[in-house]
């Protein structure tokens, strides 16, 4: 995923562990070709920095309404 495409609140799939996460920070400089992105895993209190190439955006219909989708967070999730 390109760093320019990453927006706060975007739902993404992490390639290394196939978990769904939410972008909670702007991409930060790491190397000229890679940026670090702060994410929060869904249904978890865990935050991590991931390299932007390890993230894939979920389809638009699985995004929050602010990003053009229809996803609604379940009541019993964190």
What is each PLM-predicted segment?
Residues 1-11, 75-77:
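Mixed-charge, Lys/Arg-rich low-complexity intrinsically disordered regions
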Residues 4, 16, 22, 35, ...:
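Intrinsic disorder/low-complexity segments
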Residues 43-78:
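Intrinsically disordered, low-complexity, charged/polar segments
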Residues 8-11, 15-54:
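Basic/aromatic-rich interaction segments and small domains that mediate binding to polyanionic partners
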């Amino acid at each position: 995923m390109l760093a320019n495409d990453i927006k706060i609140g975007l739902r993404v799939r992490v390639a290394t562990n196939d978990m769904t996460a939410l972008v909670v920070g702007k991409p930060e400089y790491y190397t000229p070709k890679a940026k670090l992105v702060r994410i929060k895993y869904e249904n978890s209190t865990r935050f991590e920095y991931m390299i932007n190439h390890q993230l894939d955006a979920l389809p638009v219909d699985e995004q929050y309404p602010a990003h053009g989708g229809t996803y609604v967070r379940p009541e019993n999730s964190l």
